[in-house]
Amino acid sequence: MAQEDDLRALGKVMDFMRGISVIFLLINCYWFCYEAFHTWGFTLGIVDKILMNFQRTTGLFSSILWTKLFCVVFLTLSCLGTKGVKEEKITWSKIWTVLFAGFVFFFLNWWLLALPIGKVGAASLYIFTLSLGYICLLMGGVWISRLLKNNLMDDVFNTENESFMQETRLMENEYSVNLPTRFYYKKKWNNGWINIVNPFRASMVLGTPGSGKSYAIVNNYIKQQIEKGFAMYIYDYKFPDLSEIAYNHLLHHLDAYKVKPQFYVINFDDPRKSHRCNPINPAFMTDISDAYESAYTIMLNLNRSWIQKQGDFFVESPIILLAAIIWFLKIYENGKYCTFPHAIEFLNRPYAQIFPILTSYDELANYLSPFMDAWEGGAQDQLQGQIASAKIPLSRMISPALYWVMTGDDFSLDINNPNEPKVLVVGNNPDRQNIYSAALGLYNSRIVKLINKKKQLKSSVIIDELPTIYFRGLDNLIATARSNKVAVCLGFQDFSQLTRDYGDKESKVIQNTVGNVFSGQVVGETAKTLSERFGKVLQQRQSMTINRNDKSTSISTQMDSLIPASKISNLTQGMFVGAVSDNFDERISQKIFHAEIVVDSAKVSAEMKAYQPIPVIVDFTNKDDSDNLKETIEANYRKVKEEILSLVDLEIMRIKNDPKLAHLIKM
């Protein structure tokens, strides 16, 4: 009740002040337009005497401005004490417009009284403009009291609440990868750094096509790790994009290595620009389990659906058969024919020749006992089905170019050997990825085993477009390679793609064991998963209630997503969110980032223009300068076939001539 009385009293005071303001307005008109009022018959003697006394004692009418100023002062005071109903449509631009118009009409109209249109006409025009100006000033004042000063729609996307301070220090060490950034915080853009001080805890780079994964991050990984003397293995899905960067950067930074590294290329498309390497080199296979790993990798790369069916009979059977063939070639004459093309050719011999030869060796007899039981039990259909499961997919890999590359031994796959460091790039082709991925997957699995050892050179494994190739043992490499100084960087589009091609279990392991995460624009479940990974932060919430008489504002706080999924789904090109890992002696308090990775485009373009193409490695020309590429690789292709035919004939003859083994030959 008391509050209502106070409000009522305040209203009366404001009305009184507005009344005084109107009186000053009328006095101004009466005094300075007196002749017009006299003509109209609106003068009063008592008013004249009062105004004359004011003039003698105060000089109030010595200038036309004084009464106007008093009028505006009291008008302002009356408006300040007025509480109007808040209105969202009233804006400062509208208020300033009417105030400016009011000022012009109210204060800048004195010259109208001197117009040569007669006293009455000039006075009428003056009074009209003065009144119009007063009304405009009154409107502006009332609108100020009705202005909604707390506009909750200024930050419709909650940008301020979701911006946060990020790392601004540059933290370098002998292994680190450092990326300059720009991030938004407290209404301005700031310069910062993403410091991957421990790349051995693995990194993954996600983003839809065109989000800038390779340009902003993967390329920087390659360059900076070469500058710091890493041995390197690069899977280049769109050969030679990454390969040329690695080759040219290595040329300019050979001094970063204690022992000069060699640059090697595996490229099935162009044998001229490819070294030759045998991924199942017998020197690096110590046990039949190594043969099994190789067979497993090949078959799962050729049959991606098998990844989800590991352990099934018709999945394991062809893998075991191929593993037995690889191990046989390893032990036969000290691995003279132990290459993948020889294994394919041997598998394509009739099973009546394959099984007697393989089971004639004691170490393979037990390994192949299920096949022999089926053969001896007359289950020919089952046996043929098992063999066909291996033959059909492997037949897709019969290619002279592939045979050429995989039967040579230009280098070994121990890329981080301190005495022979290497930078190896393997190139795929999107048009032939189903064929090449199986062979390249074999290189991957062998490299993983060879580099994950103690007392080797620091090394890096960079896989662009990971789902295009099945990388056997990748989850184990990520989990165990840190102590062996192996840095893994994986590039792919989103988690659903990884789950589709690697299976749910292996995909989850990869997602949850990687320590450094970069993500450009991703959508759906991937965005939600990342948002949950980045966690929540205390955010301010403001609400407003407006009624006829008053406005009330409430401010509260609540935990909400630091980087919501909707933000991750709408990141612009070059903008990344993520988190990094730190070390015991290099603590990073703010590991999460949401920033634009700064790339000097002009510098990068200049570097790329100066790049040298990867040189010709093998010269396929005759003395008369004619090209003999086709003849050479075809001759190698025929040689592999002939060597297997000869091997089979010799082995069959050996078995027939040995009384203890002769029973293996079924007539």
Put a short name on every predicted segment.
Residues 593-597:
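N-terminal charged/capping segments associated with class I S-adenosyl-L-methionine
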Residues 15, 235-236, 520:
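Active-site-adjacent beta-strand anchor residues
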Residues 54-59, 339-343, 407, 545-549:
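Short, surface-exposed recognition loops or helix-turn segments adjacent to catalytic cores
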Residues 478-480, 484-581:
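Conserved ATP-driven motor cores of ASCE-family P-loop NTPases powering translocation/secretion/packaging/pilus
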Residues 1-211, 215, 220, 547-548, ...:
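Basic- and hydrophobic-enriched, low-structure N-terminal and domain-boundary segments
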Residues 148-157, 194-486, 502, 568-572, ...:
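P-loop NTPase motor domains
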Residues 76-79, 441, 445, 516, ...:
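Hydrophobic alpha-helical segments involved in membrane association or supramolecular assembly
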Residues 589-591:
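Intrinsically disordered, low-complexity segments enriched in serine, threonine, and glycine
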